[in-house]
């Protein structure tokens, strides 16, 4: 006899959900991105790329490694081209209202952090391991 568990699958051997601000999230977010094995889906309501964008470089590296990179954005031709240039698939949604990053369909970064751009201490995000919740968020994005 075995009890079925609905506990989230912990892909990175740690189970911590933590709240971050617009400056403290970067270190952990980049660690999580670096460990991505299959997919990274980012939804960004605003695109503010610096001339040298660390996140774009990381996403380009992931794409080159065979990790599927998908970006949900509002229409912006110049920024779309930058994202296509790093190997990301682009999904345009001009009514986009959610800022989220989902790594390997189980790790969620959710809040008002701009994962593809500029942030301040006023921005925040929560990091959650939950594959069922990740599937629900992906369903919202893709419909």
Each PLM stretch: what is its role?
Residues 1-143:
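PLD/PLD-like phosphodiesterase catalytic module centered on the HKD motif
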């Amino acid at each position: 006899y075995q009890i079925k568990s609905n506990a989230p699958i912990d892909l990175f051997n740690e189970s911590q959900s933590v709240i971050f601000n617009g400056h403290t999230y970067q270190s952990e977010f980049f660690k999580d991105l670096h460990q991505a094995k299959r997919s990274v889906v980012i939804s960004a309501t605003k695109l503010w790329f610096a001339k040298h964008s660390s996140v774009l470089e990381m996403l380009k590296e992931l794409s080159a490694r065979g990790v599927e990179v998908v970006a949900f954005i509002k229409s912006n031709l110049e920024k779309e081209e930058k994202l296509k240039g790093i190997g990301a698939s682009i999904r345009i949604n001009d009514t986009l209202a959610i800022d989220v990053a989902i790594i390997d369909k189980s790790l969620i970064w959710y809040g008002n952090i701009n994962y593809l751009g500029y942030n301040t201490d006023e921005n925040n995000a929560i990091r959650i391991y939950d594959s069922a919740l990740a599937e629900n968020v992906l369903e919202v994005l893709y419909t």
